[in-house]
Amino acid sequence: MRKIIITFAAAAYAFVSYAHTHKNHSLDRQTKIVAITILAEARGEGEAGMYAVGACIAQRAFERKQTPTEVCLKKWQFSCWNGKSIKDLEHLLKTPQAKYAITVAKNV
C-alpha cells in the first residue's frame, strides 16, 4: 500500500503544471467522474483532503478490482452521487479547486 501511495503522489506531482493549462471540456468520462467526486467530497478541505479522497478511490479500485468510475458511482460509497448525474455536478469542474482535483483524478 505504501508503494501505491508513493507512486500516486509522484505521479500527481509530475502533472501539476499540466493541470493548470488543461481544458475541462476535453476530459474523459472517468477523469470527470473522479474529479467531481473529489471536489464534491473535499473541495473545502484543501489539497490534502482532495488528495486523500483520490487515494481512497485508488485504493478501493485496486482492492476491489474495479475501475475508479465503478468505485465512485457505487451506491452508498460517495454520497455526492446519490440521485445525481454527471450533468448535475459538472459545475464543480469550474471551481478554483478543480485544477488540482483534475490532476489527482488523472492519476487515480
Language-model features: locations:
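Intrinsically disordered, low-complexity segments enriched in polar/charged small residues
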Residues: T7-F8, K65
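Bacterial extracytoplasmic/cell-wall-associated proteins, especially those involved in peptidoglycan
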Residues: H20-V108
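Hydrophobic h-region of N-terminal signal peptides that target proteins for export
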Residues: F8-Y18
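Positively charged n-region of N-terminal signal peptides that target proteins for export
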Residues: M1-I4
